[in-house]
């Protein structure tokens, strides 16, 4: 029992450490919520402690094994040395994961290790690995010494049989309660969803245990068919998407269209900037000088301030952009890694007569993105490491500046109209910035200023300025090229960032909007000479349908993406956002519906305080009175229906099935 309590105390101590570390953000919440979350977390800690103590208890209280306990003890101690090492290693990873993503470590993080070279390289270049290993060794040594002391007392104790029986019964009783996780008369065991009672990420994080969370978020090895849920959701989804011939029996989302376009086969260049979070840019705060060029470019372009990544992490964001389906995959680590979602009918394929290009400074094998594109995009040419002449800068390959300069040279050589997707990576840990660039402003403000805008380090701030600089130099070069005049540039970020900025309203962060809001800029001095702020809301799934509309190509769209410039949808449209470990969001220019687990009330409706979406007040969202209103119920239904439809689309968007519909001889 002492050993069990010892293990429990370790976890509680680490939880207190997490509470102290995050107190600045947690102190904004009520004591009641903090206490409840801490109590739930302590119960999770007790469960993990109980499971960890099982090997010892089996040897102690099994009659034919206990007599050999003295001989078994060294091997048992060796087992716990290994267990302690993994235990502390998980907590180190958990704290690092939370520092970067504001969420406790989950199985999606394990998926990142599949790209072993990049993952280990990033860890080595970002974190003080040697110091952390020393901490690991010291902590494990201390825990092992304490465990050895407790085990020695048991070996040399001369207890009567009755005492051992009493101890065994008491320990078994405590063990059952701790594993069950409920310290009262409750007819179901402690479940992960109880930690989500508040609807706030910070409170939820306090209530979770990283080991339990890894187990709860592990991918399923099977797909749970949701056909019936998708069929029920179909009428609303079909109406929302504008399906021309809805058929609930076939559950098809086919839409056929062709706009006049803006010109004769304009080139399309899509640039996706790593972690280009709106709330860390000059686009939201004039005082910030992180993205001065991007700010200037927005005043010469179509600028969409109400634009959001459809999902978090780069792999999910890029899958959403490429396919037009929000990556809501909960059965595998990400859809790009799921063999059952590899066959997709893409709008990108509708660009007949276009040269299709994908460029990245590192290796295109990351997260199996190469597989997604090669399998689904006819005639695509991928340019990645090994092709570029510039030297490798860090784990992510060549720098954004070098990638964009070489991309410009490559685009200049194209003989046919082209559509190119360029993926940048410099604004990512370890935030490497080359030294000695003559016209790069290396000025970094003081720590107080950095904290005000949620920059964790001076290097992060400088890396964002370098990214903006790289973009500026690219446009300077592109304007001298032969392709520039007939090219439409679409610029966005893959996702936002997790750090909560004191400069935005609390509700904005509580809804996790800071993790998803990114800029969208459509630039063409020829086709859009007049700048305009586009108030309609959009998301990553809309990029290729919008590009197709601009190019005037014939489109067969079977996904959730829509043309942002299609006037038939109007300004009052919603975009769907898949959140990490929380139900999805539905956001418009005016409203935000936050779906939540039932423990957190089932959902909440907010209204933006300021309709001026470029104003800093745009991050202020106010609770709407009458949460049972017609609007609330409507948005809750749309949210649920789009969620089910997105899951269904992931597994039922095969190219062959889409081709059947386009075949003139095909009859429904």
Q: Which residues does each PLM region occupy?
A:
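Transmembrane and membrane-interface helices of multi-pass
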Residues: 1-224
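Short, highly charged low-complexity linear segments
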Residues: 114-121, 125, 151-156, 234-238, ...
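Alpha-helix initiation and N-capping motif
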Residues: 10, 113-117, 208-211, 227-230, ...
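General structural signal for secondary-structure boundaries
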Residues: 26-30, 101-106, 118, 124-129, ...
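A broad, low-specificity signal for short, low-complexity segments enriched in glycine/proline
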Residues: 67-72, 80-83, 100, 163, ...
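The feature marks either
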Residues: 115, 199-203, 207-257, 264-265, ...
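Short alpha-helical "patches" and their helix-cap loops
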Residues: 70-71, 226-235, 333-339, 561-562
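Solvent-exposed soluble domains appended to multi-pass membrane proteins
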Residues: 242-668
